[in-house]
Amino acid sequence: MPPVKAPGNVSDCYFVGRVSLLKWISELLNEPVKKVEDLASGHHYCMALNLVYPGQVNMHRVRMNAINEWERSENFKIIQDVLSRNNIDKGIDVNKLVTGKYMDNFEFFQWFKWFFDQNYKGSKSGATESGSANAVTKTSKPGNRSGSTAASMQNPKASSTSGPSIDSKELEDLRRQIAKGQLESQFYFDKLHEIEIYMDQMNELMTQVEIAEPEDSPFYIKSVVKKIEDILYAEYHQ
């Protein structure tokens, strides 16, 4: 089996939004996940990975809702081991993910969703067992759905021809708009990522160099860095 390559930064997987990802993982695992930072625990990925490769994840070793970085590291090492054994070419920067920073975890979250969709062969509408972890379910409401299904089976032509038609020109225009939006989204994502890298470099530099500006000054370099970090890592509120 040839290795499954991780997509580059221009891949469509990096255009999936935070809200969609959190909704997906919450429904998949039947466990509410409210923040991207919660994924730093690693146990969510272990549970989902055990659906892709049933029985290959030793769920007895997984530390659920891990808080300490060393516990989280153990979970991500389990994930890395399973991926490597299945010839998946994806390096995991464990040291970054376990700190719980939004940008690092969001990027890995996007990749994992892409990977799951590419490799999961089970039913996404029924209950699925996840090793020794909790049962992972994704249910749909009965009633109206079954009724509409029965109606479509009785009258297949009606279901196949219903809805407005879109000509090729309109479809092409929509594709161009989507492509433009994706490029703009990636552009701003890259900017944020560069700022995060710069902040890490500045924090490291400030531990080695004495700053002459008084600490109570709004232009004090540590104050500037702290303010930018506050903006970068502020939680989203609907």
Swiss-Prot record:
Classification via SUPFAM superfamilies: Calponin-homology domain, CH-domain, EB1 dimerisation domain-like
Stored InterPro entries: CH_dom, CH_dom_sf, EB1_C, EB1_C_sf, MAPRE
Principal location listed in the UniProt entry: nucleus
GO biological process: cell division; intraciliary transport; microtubule nucleation; mitotic cell cycle; mitotic cytokinesis; mitotic nuclear division; protein localization to microtubule; regulation of microtubule cytoskeleton organization
Organism: Giardia intestinalis (strain ATCC 50803 / WB clone C6) (Giardia lamblia)
Domain spans labelled Calponin-homology (CH): 15-117
Record's note on what induces expression: Expression remains constant throughout the cell cycle (at protein level). Expression remains constant in trophozoites and in encysting cells (at protein level).
Keywords per UniProt: Cell cycle, Cell division, Cell projection, Cilium, Cytoplasm, Cytoskeleton, Disulfide bond, Flagellum, Membrane, Microtubule, Mitosis, Nucleus, Phosphoprotein
Domain commentary: Interaction between the C-terminal EB1-specific domains of two protein monomers is sufficient for homodimerization.
Keyword Coiled coil on entry: no
Subunit structure: Homodimer; disulfide-linked and via interaction of the C-terminal EB1-specific domains. Interacts with BOP1 (via C-terminal WD repeats). Interacts with giardin subunit gamma, neurogenic locus notch homolog protein, GL50803_8358 and GL50803_11327. Interacts (via C-terminal residues 101-238) with aurora kinase. Interacts with tubulin gamma chain.
Database matches in PROSITE patterns: CH (PS50021), EB1_C (PS51230)
Impact reported for residue 148 to D: Mimics phosphorylated form of the protein rescuing cytokinesis defects caused by the inhibitor of aurora kinase
GO molecular function: identical protein binding; microtubule plus-end binding; protein homodimerization activity
CC terms in the record's Gene Ontology section: 9+2 motile cilium; axoneme; ciliary pocket collar; ciliary tip; cytoplasm; cytoplasmic microtubule; cytoskeleton; distal portion of axoneme
Upper taxonomic lineage: Eukaryota, Metamonada, Diplomonadida, Hexamitidae, Giardiinae
Job description of the protein: Involved in cell division. Involved in mitosis. Regulates dynamics of microtubules (MTs) during mitosis. Required for cytokinesis. Binds polymerized MTs in vitro. Is able to rescue a mitotic division defect, the proper positioning of the nucleus, of the S.cerevisiae BIM1 knockout mutant in a complementation assay. May play a role in spindle positioning and MT distribution. May be involved in MT nucleation for the formation of median bodies and in the biogenesis of flagella.
Domain EB1 C-terminal as annotated: residue spans: 156-238
Gene3D superfamilies linked: 1.20.5.1430, Calponin-like domain
Descriptive protein name: End-binding protein 1
Post-translational modification, as annotated: Phosphorylated in vitro by aurora kinase. Phosphorylation is important for cell division.
Region (Interaction with aurora kinase): 101-238
